[in-house]
Amino acid sequence: MSSNNGDVRLWGARFADGPAEALAKLSASVHFDWRLAPYDIAGSRAHARVLSKAGLLSEDELTRMLAGLDQLEADVADGSFTGTIADEDVHTALERGLLERLGADLGGKLRAGRSRNDQIATLFRMYLRDHARTIGGLIADLQSALVGLAEAHADVAMPGRTHLQHAQPVLFAHHVLAHVQSLSRDAERLRQWDERTAVSPYGSGALAGSSLGLDPQAVAADLGFERGSVANSIDGTASRDFVAEFAFITAMIGVNLSRIAEEVIIWNTKEFSFVTLHDAFSTGSSIMPQKKNPDIAELARGKSGRLIGNLTGLLATLKALPLAYNRDLQEDKEPVFDSCDQLEVLLPAFTGMMATLTVNRERMEELAPAGFSLATDIAEWLVKQGVPFRVAHEVAGACVKECERAGIELDQLTDEQFAEISEHLTPEVRTVLNVRGALASRDGRGGTAPSAVAVQLAEVKEDLAAQHAWATARP
């Protein structure tokens, strides 16, 4: 099909001269907004139907219009029709394509009652709603991999840390499920965002609506916007908070991935040796033959900064725009397009890394009680004996001090040493000076006891089933 670049600009009748070449280059967006073409065509179909309903297209014209749009869609899909810089944007390129297929008399009727302002606000929502589900599904895949990791190592103890220092023993599964929870909130944010975004600006025109008797609600229903059309046409064309919110969610996903990545990088070092990465998800060095690098985790850290940058750049663009539409809003698309692209490449690789890593159980359990991490258990044992916690805390601290002086661990203190530290420290205190006992004692909701972690696993699996169902459904 011909891609003749005749001048079909959607503006210009009141200008004596065409745009300067420098302006045309600056103004062009078709090189990045062409990905919206399928949504633009879907919007055109819905618009053609309301034009017909309003008596502005005959039944025969509607039939031919829809056939022309079907042909244009097929030509876009197979690459035989593409936009060029001369088209300025995706809307103009597709209008050119429609005119080539239907002629100006019929093809030119589609412009009635719509503006690029309401078009782009609608198409952008449609695009992001689809990609929200794609990303949500990829998050669910990662969560499933993490759940599998937790289940396969359900009884492995490890040192829990605060300030990156030994704190208290926890189950490895408990630690992994903490990351699953943060990702669950990311997925929930996507679902809540989608619900808010399910309103269509189509029919808002440039800003004031249309006088042609068109039905915005019919277009909204046709395009899968469950909440109908926007309540205010100015807001519909001018607001991009839905874009900023989406950019925040993707940035938050990046931050949460980066936190997991940082731990994987640390755990994979010789000094920690908590995990070993699979060869298929590691890289080597061009000069050091022994190297096995955690590149996926490092790229996740780097890309999180990129996602944050996309958000901050977008907010800076939006911060001072008066109502209604301003051309600044051309700059709203590339940041979030990039955020989608980055996550849709990163998440599968990250999931593969987590699903295939080897957990070094012996090393984790060796270090679980290290660093006097059972000191809190001594304090809590004393509390159960009726000792005020302030006193119990001081006594446990004195035990740590004595161990540091003697170069031993807490469970190596003798009965005599315990008695010298405090009269409350009877030999029975030894019942809590073991990792398994410390873990089992923390059996409240959300705790690290095996029984509590089993409940967390069951709840996460239930949530994941709902998340997968949402991700595979399309509006």
Swiss-Prot record:
Source gene? argH
Name used for this protein in its record: Argininosuccinate lyase
Q: Which organism is it from?
A: Streptomyces griseus subsp. griseus (strain JCM 4626 / CBS 651.72 / NBRC 13350 / KCC S-0626 / ISP 5235)
Q: Name one GO molecular function term.
A: argininosuccinate lyase activity
**For this protein, what reaction is catalysed?**
2-(N(omega)-L-arginino)succinate = fumarate + L-arginine
User: Which Gene Ontology terms describe the biological processes this protein takes part in?
Assistant: arginine biosynthetic process via ornithine; L-arginine biosynthetic process
User: Annotated pathway, please?
Assistant: Amino-acid biosynthesis; L-arginine biosynthesis; L-arginine from L-ornithine and carbamoyl phosphate: step 3/3
Query: Matching InterPro entries, A to Z?
Result: Arg_succ_lyase_C, Argininosuccinate_lyase, Fumarase/histidase_N, Fumarate_lyase_CS, Fumarate_lyase_fam, Fumarate_lyase_N, L-Aspartase-like
Taxonomy, top ranks, is: Bacteria, Bacillati, Actinomycetota, Actinomycetes, Kitasatosporales
- Which Pfam families does the UniProt record give? ASL_C2, Lyase_1
Q: Name one GO cellular component term.
A: cytosol
